[in-house]
């Protein structure tokens, strides 16, 4: 008796055997009845060259997708996060995300535009100037984005000295006598940089009323001029106008919700008011928002000091002293002068 696996059975009624050669012994379990030899022949049938080429092309596409998809997904995520952060005025986050996106697509004009806006609103003017130079002569299809970048470029001019101001600084070796400075300001009433520079000198000399007057004039020309808003917050604190000081900090935060220095400025106002617990909370918040700003670190040093946490205060001072940044050293020196009593920060 033959093996039943190779017999034509009632599973294929009316079948005369192998559909290819007619042999009675077929392999069951397949739609087409074939004997073992014919089925093996079909299995070993040569694949046409065209099909091989097509299959190879599909394989290459799949391999490319496997490598490029994670990169493209990452790029898309950075752009999406950066765009969302920009709409929420979280410009530190926006600058971080668009920087990562730009590293993948350095020639993408829209990414560079978003990066420029974030840098400007973070007052990272060195980064902004580099990006702005790249954008000169470029075409931007997004009209709304173009308008924002164009406005930022126009405003950037007020953050650097004009040629006439540079010449005056050269003549007096960066130590312009008061009468000469006043004459220059009268002749250049719209030179925001010069007026702010003079206001800074007045602040350092404790000439608060004329400083206040000049800063208000600056803000009439540009209500969002960051340095003037920041100095106004400090000025009003020194004048004991604490609500007004907070108002200027809020103006900064309305422009950039991640302006950590505005939060730190509020913390210093609370220290002036001897609201030390609230001051510490604000100082910690400023560090959480922007841990790289030395002003925020110096503020936290002061907050630790007035809250009696000398261990954390001294540890942070030591950490800051390892930093070679001149601005960091200047801010920390001020904080240590307050701690030692060399500078009087508030009444005892």
Where are these regions (language model features)?
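Alpha-helical segment of the N-proximal tetratricopeptide repeat
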Residues: 68-104, 159-187, 191-204
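Terminal, low-structured helical/coil segments at or just beyond the last alpha-helical repeat
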Residues: 34-37, 298-299, 303-348
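Register position in tetratricopeptide repeats
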Residues: 87, 121, 155, 204-205, ...
């Amino acid at each position: 008796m033959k093996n039943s696996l190779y017999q034509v059975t009632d599973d294929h009624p009316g079948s005369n055997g192998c559909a290819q050669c007619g042999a009675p012994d077929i392999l069951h379990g397949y739609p087409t009845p074939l004997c073992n030899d014919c089925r093996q022949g079909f299995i070993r049938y040569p694949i046409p060259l065209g099909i091989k080429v097509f299959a190879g092309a599909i394989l290459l596409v799949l391999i490319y997708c496997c490598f490029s998809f994670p990169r493209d997904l990452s790029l898309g995520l950075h752009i999406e996060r950066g765009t969302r952060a920009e709409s929420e005025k979280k410009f530190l986050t926006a600058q971080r995300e668009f920087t990562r996106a730009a590293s993948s697509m350095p020639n993408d004009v829209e990414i560079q535009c978003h990066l420029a806006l974030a840098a400007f609103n973070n007052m990272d003017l060195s980064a902004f100037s580099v990006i702005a130079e790249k954008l000169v002569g470029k075409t931007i299809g997004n009209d709304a984005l173009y308008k924002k970048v164009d406005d930022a470029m126009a405003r950037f001019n007020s953050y650097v000295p004009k040629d006439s101001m540079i010449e005056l600084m050269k003549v007096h070796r960066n130590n312009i006598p008061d009468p000469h400075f006043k004459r220059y300001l009268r002749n250049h009433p719209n030179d925001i940089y010069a007026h702010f520079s003079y206001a800074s000198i007045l602040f350092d000399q404790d000439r608060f009323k004329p400083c206040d007057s000049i800063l208000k004039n600056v803000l009439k020309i540009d209500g969002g001029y960051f340095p003037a808003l920041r100095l106004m917050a400090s000025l009003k604190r020194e004048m004991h106008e604490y609500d007004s000081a907070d108002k200027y900090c809020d103006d900064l935060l309305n422009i950039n919700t991640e302006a950590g220095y505005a939060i730190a400025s509020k913390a210093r106002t609370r220290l002036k008011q001897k609201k030390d617990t609230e001051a510490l909370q604000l100082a910690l918040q400023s560090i959480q928002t922007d841990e790289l700003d030395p002003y925020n670190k110096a503020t936290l040093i002061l907050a630790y000091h007035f809250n009696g946490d000398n261990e954390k205060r001294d540890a942070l001072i030591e950490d800051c002293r390892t930093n070679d940044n001149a601005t960091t050293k200047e801010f920390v020196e001020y904080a240590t002068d307050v701690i030692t009593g060399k500078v009087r920060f508030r009444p005892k």
